[in-house]
Every structure is written in C-alpha cells, then in structure tokens.
C-alpha cells in the first residue's frame, strides 16, 4: 500500500477558497525564474499571474513549449487549436508535467472563435497559423482592458472601454450614494467567474478601480471557514477573479468605515496609525501619510475621501480596541448577532469613527491645505461630500457643512425639529436592521438623506442650509439616489410575503411616492447600476429594472451584507460571503453584461461530432449484479443484488490522479471506470488493476460516467457529452450540450459556463444530460440517442420557469431518474428539477415570488462542504435504512434501520436535510450506528451493507470502509483507508469486488481472500 497523500492538499488544489489565496505581498510569482523562448514570451506579455490564452503552437515548437510557459510564474493557460493531433500532444505534455486541469486547459476549436468569455484573459500568445485566421477584434474581445496579445509580428494591447466607471470609495463615491455611473454593465448578464475566497470574516469593506477590486476583511469569524482571512486585504481582478496579491491588516482596528479609496494606480488604506498608499498592481507600500501633528486629538483616521487629487479626512483619538475572534464552528449557515466590542457607541471620545478635526492634504507633497476643528465630536457614519462641500453630523448636536476648497464653515444647523427628526442613534445589531457601524448619511445635488440601521425614520434635509424637508416612518430604508427618484429598499416586516411592497421610489422635493418596490430581506446594502437597483431578496438577489420596475430574481447568490453588489469596470461583483446564508453559489462572483448573446440558440447539427463508426460496437456484458452508474442505478438507490464479501482485503490500488479528485467508481463487464477532474476517463481491469484504456475530454469530469449497451458515456465540464466503446475506449461521438463554447474560471478551474456538471443517466437507449450552473445563464437539458448522439428532445427554457420573476432551474446536483422523470437538485428556487422523460417538458410549477428556499453546496464545487451522502433505502420487507447529512456537512443523524411501520409514517425530508436537526428526537430504530462516523457512500444488500466515511469530520481523522450486518448493525469487517473517499465513492461488481475512489487520487479494490 502506498503512502497516503495529504488530503487537505488535494482539496485545496481544487478549492479556490484557499488555493487562489496562496499569494502574498512581495512573494515571487511561481517558482524559480526561467529563461528561454517561453520565458521571453511571458516577459513580452508583461503578466505573471492570471489567465493566458495560447492559440496554436508557434512554428517549430513542440508541445513542451506550452508547459514551459507555466514555469516561473503563476499563469493559468488556455490552449486552443483546431488540430486534433496538436491538442492531443499538448494534453499529453500537460499531463506529464502535472499541469493538466490545474494550470493548463486544452480545447479543440477553430481560430475564428476563441472559447473564452469576453474581457477574461490577462494575455494571449498567437501562433503564426492562428494569426492568419483569427481577427484582431476577436482577440480584443477575450482580452481584459490593458492586456497584451503577442502575435508573431507585433503586440496588440486592448484599450480601456468607454463608459466604464470605478467604485473608488466604499459607497461608490464620497457622497455615499451607491449608484454606479458605469454605462457598460447592463442587463442581462452572464457569469464571468466563480472564485475564492468563499467565506470571510466580518466586517468587510470593498473598493474597485482600474480592473481591480480591493477587499478588506476584519476581525470577527463566526465560522471556522472564515479564519484564514482574518485581518486580511486582498486585491483581485474584476474580470476573472484571480487574486493578484494579499496583505495582512493590523489587528485592533475596526475597518467598517470610509477609510479606503481606490484609483487605477494606488490604494489608499487608512487605520489607527496612518494612511498607507499601496501600489495597485502589486500591493507594494509606496508611501505612508500620518495625521499632521497638533491638529487632531490623535492619529486615528475616521473618514477619508479622495477627490480631484486632494485627500480629505476626519481624524481623532484612540478608539475602543477590537480583538481578533477566530471560530471553531463548522458549516455554512447562520451565526449569532450581538453587541460586539465597541458597537454600542457609548462614548464619543472612544467611539468608532468619532473625531473632531477635518483636514485636506495634497497626498503627493503631504502639504496640509486646510484644517478645521469642532468642539463636538463628529460621527464619521454621518459624513459625506460632493464636489464642493463636506457635510457632517454631530449626533443630537448639529448638522454642518464645510467648503471643501478652504475648510470654512458654510452653515451649521441645530434646529430642534431637524435634530428631533433625525433622533438619537438606535441600537441596530440585528439581522433585520443591520450593523451599527453602517454609514447613515448621503448627499445628492441639493439634498441630504439620513437612513440606516440606527435611524428611527428617513429624514431629508436641504443641502444648502440643513433645513428639514420631509420624513418617512421607518428609518432603515436602504437608499439608492438616481436621477429619476429616490429608490428606498424597504425593511423586512414580519408576516409579509417576499413580494410585499415595503419599499418605495420617492420624489426628491417632497417625498411623494412614485412607485412601490418589493420588500428586501434583512440588512444587506442596496446598490444601483445604469439600469437596475440591487438588494437582497427573500434570499438571493433582487434586481429591479428601473425602466419598467420589473422584478428579476438572481436566485443562487445574495449580495454580501456590508458591500452589496459592486459595479466597476463594466462588471458586477458579488461576495465573498461573511455570512452563511443558505444559497447555492458562494464566494467571489463576477457577472458580465451579456450584450447580444443568444441564450436559446436551439439545437442544430453543429453540436454533434461523430468520431468513428457508431453502429458496430464491441459488446461489454453488464449484469444485474454490476454497478453501471453512480450509486448503482439511475434512481441513485445504492442498492445491489451482489452479496457483500465476508472478509475482504485490499487486492490492488492505482493512482488515478496525482492532483486528486477522481469521480466515484462504476463497475461492469469486468472493468472499473471513473473520471477525474483533469478531464480523463479511466477503464481499469477489475481483476488486477491494470489500465485497460484512458481517454481525454476537454474539461473536468465531475460525476461518474455510465455504461450501457457496450458504450460508456461521460459528461464533461467543457459542456460536452462523450461516448466511447466501453471495452476499448474508442471514441464514438461528442455532443455539445452548452449553447456556446464560452469558458470561465469556476473555483480554480477553467470550464464551460454550462458544464455537464450533473453527469449522465442512460435508460432504454437514451442518454440524458444537462448543462449549466446558474438559471440566469440558462439551463440546457437533452435526451440523446445513445447509439448516435442525435437529439431526441431538448429543453432550453427551464432556466426561466417564472417569467414574472425571471428565475428558474439551476443545475446543482447529479442527474437521476425517478417515477418516470429526469431529476436533479435545482439550486434555490426549486428544490428539485423535474422533466418528463418522454418529452422533456419541465414539470416544475412557477414560483412567482422572489425567494430562494432550497439551499445546496454541490460537492464538485464545494468538496469541503458537501461530501456526505444521505440515504433512504427501503428494503423489500418495508424496513428503511436511513442516514441524514446536512447539505453543507455540519450536521448528521445516526445511521439507523427503521421498522416498516415507523418507516411508513416518516414525513418527507428536504433534499438538503437542512432543518432536520430542529425536528427533535429521531424515531427509534431497530439499531443505530454510533454518531461519530460520517458517511460518504453506501452499498446496500438485503443482508448487509458497506459504508465508507470519516471517523471525524476533519482532515486528521481516520477514514474507513466498513461492512455492517443488516439485522443488528454490528460490524462484520472494518478497513482503514489512506484518505477520504469521494462522495458516493464506493461500488461493487457482480463477483463481490468492492471499489473505492479517494479524494487523494487513488482507486482501491477489495476482494474476498
């Protein structure tokens, strides 16, 4: 038996929650710097990290040239060529170098169309043969602004697009109005990237400019998965999510305030010591600015803005220190609110953000242009500015205004009616209201607005003198100030439905109601784009089309609590999450304008490629005792007719993938099959572990293949379904289920926007497959003739089951067939997608409210959260073998055998098993397994079962393969495994051999002595 690999390393290689976080300031890019033609080419690119497209092999170069491009840097390479032989050579070289499916992705395709999303690549290298075909416009399409394409005779650089805007300040601008001026980021959208980190501590503050987003993460972790980012600053590409650099933040400073400003050249980041000026591209410290001596109560930066080259600030004395709070709590969902350190705001002298001195400075020379000191403390949450004036509020004392050019007081208003309307600060710190640290004052043209978690009512005052104009009850409106009116996302109110109108569009001059808006969920910030307003729905994201007030529900993800949806450089950015709300997509997510993209192009002959004779196929005998598909059958029952061996031992092992992550195994006809995340299909002889054949697809294989009628079928993350002669590996046909060849980064890998992520099921000569991730991109479901690959039916409309809400089916689970229906976990809006097997009609009823009620954490994307396999297996006599594990791996029940009468009375369980932990005492079974074990896969026979899993749900625990007697649950035999099994990663064949695939890349076989 070989030495087991470190399982954590295998997981991190796949999960960008950590793998993209591995860089740090001043760390060299990649390994040793190299020399030679490839290194020279990278130097011409001027890019050491990000995504680089490579079109064809340069004249006279071998495939190794492409792998050499990856040396001495951290580039992710996408190679494309129309030549099958060239594609095969590069795949082979990438495989040998350990880069395939990790840092080098290979696609077959002509040069007229590069298979990458718009604005995605950080560089491109074009061979002579490709340069003769591909147009400059196509190269510019896939390049991000300011990226270079190296052609044989020139270098092409993409200019910055007209009409883009930045998100330079925490609330977009110093006016605190979260309304973008970007004219490019228009609906509809397509996913641009899904990236890490997935989860981060609070608070979270973000700004963006020059194609980069800067995110600062604070001091409080409520879940263990947030600890890695405590007190950390990251810089990431807004175009592909690549983390460009990271930097630690000083402990003890509460970051949730306006003290971060981004420009294309620099990030200004202030704290309790100084304002650091960091080089935007590298994080290098270029300068440091301190509060000038003698003008303030101390060195602490309370508020900051940068406008027309002048740095404005509010400074003051030391604040309540905050302590770093890591967590040991597992899982995703929910955390406790409370009055955390300093959040009670009980002393103006030490409150977060309270200061008495404003000043303006030339940041280049550090010359103070002016300073102004107040006797009373000013609350930085109540500070904003337009191009000429700084507005500021001293709680319950006065509202004031400074001339930004000279620092003189323009007016001060302490009118009783005004102060009474604004009122004292409320407590906040509740999931419905939000954070006490939230900014509550905004300005727009001639108006000042007070609203937020701490406010009793919405208050509007005149910007010229502070005169009270109008008020509205409920102070916790989230405002977006647009030219056509004041958009106020209304508070969550108990007992009201998800589509209830608690929000409004108000007129500026008098607060007249111009329109009603659907209720928002809880505390998350509202933001605005050129044509939309975004806020949190009753889970998910609400998008209000401002032209017609139409409702569009983006179901799989919600805006992050303290940032909302950020719009910058023509892109829309979500996450990462500091909360743990139950959704389907997590992490740092980018959406791009779809432009004229055809979401429903229909099906035509171009999708199918016949690769060889499809009629004469070598038979592969499959018996009823075999395991020809994931979890044994199309219903995913994990049942077998094969008797469990009495005392097996390990027969052989095979290293399938050095980088880890094979799929679950299947077994039929004397062979064992699996796929892997490098895009390979493996066929291994069951008797001795010898390789029978191996084939490559274009993308990761995320779910086990299936065998039927002498053919093996696999769904690939490149958006295709592949068919092979199962006995020999001869390719038969390839079918593109994705509507287009459009690759994006998905949690550390490049894959299609529409991967065939749920695997395939085969029944009665028909292969069923689905392509997609998120409903708003479209979900594409096909029934194909198993012999020829020809389309029998297709459904390309289920992504929108409710035109009223513009939401529908996402693809977030393995395909199955039950009750004459094709099914899979549907991601948020619908618990399970359902399609008529004969016609492809979607059977899900429309959900005409903006609600995401069904969480998921699909194992191929989140292997650290969704690895455990729930089981409800009914035996012939009516007894029920059951095990429940929550979708995100934080809770489980005991593995139990229920008597028939008890089993018949069991209520329906949610697929996510979320909420079962609150149902009270589970029913008494005939036997229960000890709860310390966490189960990943099962093989169930009438008299015994085999289970694989973990003794403890952490990387250090033992991992096992165990057989239990069905009669009493006693252990028949127990084998310790050298790593964690993949989800559902156990199979049995007709001779009683048991096969297990491990996340560390091993395939193991066990057989009776």
How should each PLM-predicted stretch be described?
Residues 41, 45, 49, 105-108, ...:
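Aromatic (tryptophan-biased) beta-strands that constitute blades/sheets of beta-rich domains
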Residues 48-68, 78:
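Conserved class I S-adenosyl-L-methionine
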Residues 121-133:
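A short SAM/SAH-binding and catalytic strip from SAM-dependent methyltransferases
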Residues 11-23:
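Bacterial N-terminal signal peptides
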Residues 200-233, 249-276, 296-359, 372-399, ...:
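Repeat-blade elements of multi-bladed beta-propeller folds
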Residues 89-114:
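S-adenosyl-L-methionine
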Residues 112-123:
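A short acidic, Gly/Pro-enriched loop at the edge of an enzyme's catalytic core
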Residues 133-147:
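A short glycine-rich, Lys/Arg-flanked "PGG" loop and its adjoining helix->strand segment in the class I
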């Amino acid at each position: 038996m070989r030495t087991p690999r470190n399982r954590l390393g295998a997981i991190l290689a796949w999960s960008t929650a950590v793998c993209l976080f591995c860089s740090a300031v001043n760390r060299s890019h990649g390994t040793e710097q190299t020399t030679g033609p490839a290194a020279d080419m990278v130097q011409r690119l001027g890019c050491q990290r990000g995504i680089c497209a490579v079109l064809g092999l340069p004249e006279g170069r071998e495939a190794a040239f492409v792998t050499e491009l990856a040396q001495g840097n951290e580039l992710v390479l996408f190679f494309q060529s129309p030549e099958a032989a060239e594609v095969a050579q590069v795949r082979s070289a990438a495989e040998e170098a350990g880069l395939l499916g990790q840092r080098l992705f290979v696609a077959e395709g002509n040069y007229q169309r590069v298979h990458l999303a718009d604005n995605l690549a950080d560089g491109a290298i074009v061979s002579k043969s490709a340069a003769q075909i591909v147009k400059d416009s196509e190269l510019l399409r896939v390049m991000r602004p300011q990226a270079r394409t190296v052609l044989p005779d020139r270098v092409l650089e993409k200019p910055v697009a007209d009409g883009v805007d930045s998100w330079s300040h925490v609330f977009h601008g110093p006016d605190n109005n979260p309304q973008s001026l970007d004219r490019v980021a228009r609906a509809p959208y397509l996913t641009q990237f899904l990236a890490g980190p997935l989860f981060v501590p609070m608070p979270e503050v973000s700004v963006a400019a020059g194609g980069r987003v800067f995110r600062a993460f604070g001091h409080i972790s409520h879940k263990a998965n947030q600890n890695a980012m405590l007190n950390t600053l990251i810089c990431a590409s807004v175009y592909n999510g690549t983390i460009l650099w990271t930097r630690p933040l000083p402990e003890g400073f509460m970051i949730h305030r306006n003290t971060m400003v981004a420009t294309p050249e620099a990030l200004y980041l202030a704290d309790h010591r100084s304002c650091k000026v960091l080089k935007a591209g590298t994080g290098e410290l270029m300068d440091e600015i301190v509060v000038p001596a003698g003008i303030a109560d101390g060195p602490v930066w309370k508020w900051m803005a940068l406008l027309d080259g002048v740095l404005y600030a509010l400074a003051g004395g030391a604040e309540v220190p905050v302590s770093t709070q890591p967590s040991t709590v597992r899982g995703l969902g929910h955390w406790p609110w409370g009055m955390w350190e300093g959040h009670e705001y009980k002393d103006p002298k030490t409150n977060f953000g309270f200061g008495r001195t404003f000043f303006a400075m030339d940041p280049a020379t550090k010359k103070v242009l002016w300073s102004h000191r107040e006797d009373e403390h000013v609350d930085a949450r109540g500070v904003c500015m337009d191009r000429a004036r700084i507005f500021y509020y001293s709680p319950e004392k006065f509202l004031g205004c400074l001339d930004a050019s000279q620092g003189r007081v323009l007016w001060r208003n302490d009118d009783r009616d005004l102060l009474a309307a604004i009122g004292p600060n409320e407590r906040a710190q509740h999931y419905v209201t939000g954070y006490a640290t939230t900014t509550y004052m905004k300005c727009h043209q001639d108006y000042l607005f007070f609203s937020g978690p701490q406010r009793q009512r919405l208050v509007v005052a005149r910007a010229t003198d502070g005169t009270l104009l109008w008020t509205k009850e409920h102070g916790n409106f989230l405002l977006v100030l647009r030219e056509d009116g004041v958009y106020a996302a209304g508070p969550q109110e108990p007992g009201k439905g998800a589509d209830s109108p608690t929000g409004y569009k108000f007129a500026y001059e008098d607060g007249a109601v111009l329109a009603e808006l659907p209720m928002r969920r809880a505390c998350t910030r509202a933001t605005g784009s050129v044509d939309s307003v975004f806020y949190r729905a009753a889970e998910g994201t609400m998008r209000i089309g401002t032209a017609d007030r139409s409702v569009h529900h983006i179901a799989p993800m919600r805006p992050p609590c303290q940032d909302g949806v950020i719009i910058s450089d023509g892109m829309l950015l979500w996450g990462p999450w500091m909360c743990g709300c139950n959704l389907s997509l997590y992490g740092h997510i980018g959406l791009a304008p779809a432009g004229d993209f055809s979401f429903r192009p229909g099906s035509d002959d171009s999708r199918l490629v016949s690769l060889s004779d499809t009629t004469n196929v070598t038979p592969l005998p499959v018996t009823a005792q075999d395991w020809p598909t994931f979890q044994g059958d199309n219903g995913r029952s994990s049942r077998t007719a094969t008797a469990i061996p009495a005392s097996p031992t390990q027969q052989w092992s095979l290293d399938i993938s050095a980088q880890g992550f094979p799929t679950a195994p299947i077994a039929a006809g004397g062979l064992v099959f699996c796929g892997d995340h490098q895009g390979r299909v493996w066929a291994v002889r069951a008797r001795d572990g010898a390789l029978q054949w191996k084939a490559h697809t274009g993308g990761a294989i995320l779910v086990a293949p299936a065998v039927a009628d002498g053919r093996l079928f696999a769904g690939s993350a490149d958006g295709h379904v592949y068919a092979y002669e199962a006995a020999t590996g001869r390719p038969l046909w390839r079918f593109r289920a994705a509507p287009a060849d459009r690759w994006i980064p998905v949690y550390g890998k490049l894959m299609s926007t529409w991967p065939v992520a749920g695997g395939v099921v085969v029944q009665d000569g028909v292969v069923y497959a689905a392509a997609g991730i998120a409903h708003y991109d479209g979900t594409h479901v096909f029934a194909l003739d198993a012999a020829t690959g020809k389309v029998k039916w297709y459904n390309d409309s289920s992504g929108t089951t409710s035109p009223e809400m513009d939401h529908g089916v996402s693809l977030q689970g393995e395909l199955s067939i039950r009750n004459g229906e094709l099914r899979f976990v549907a991601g948020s809006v619908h618990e399970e997608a359902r399609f008529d097997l004969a016609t492809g009609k979607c059977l899900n009823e429309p959900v005409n409210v903006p609600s995401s009620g069904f969480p998921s954490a699909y194992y191929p994307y989140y292997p650290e959260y969704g690895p455990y396999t729930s089981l409800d297996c009914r035996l012939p006599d009516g007894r029920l073998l059951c095990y429940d594990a929550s979708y995100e791996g934080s809770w489980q029940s005991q593995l139990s055998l229920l008597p028939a009468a008890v089993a018949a009375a069991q209520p329906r369980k949610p697929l996510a098993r979320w909420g079962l932990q609150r149902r009270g005492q589970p029913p008494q079974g005939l036997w229960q397994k000890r709860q310390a074990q966490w189960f990943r896969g099962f093989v169930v026979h009438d008299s015994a079962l085999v289970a694989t899993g973990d003794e403890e749900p952490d990387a250090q625990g033992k991992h096992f393969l165990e057989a239990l007697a069905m009669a009493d649950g006693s252990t028949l035999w127990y084998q310790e495994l050298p790593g964690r099994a993949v989800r559902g990663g156990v199979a049995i064949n007709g001779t009683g051999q048991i096969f297990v695939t491990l996340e560390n890349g091993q395939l193991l076989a066990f057989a009776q002595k």
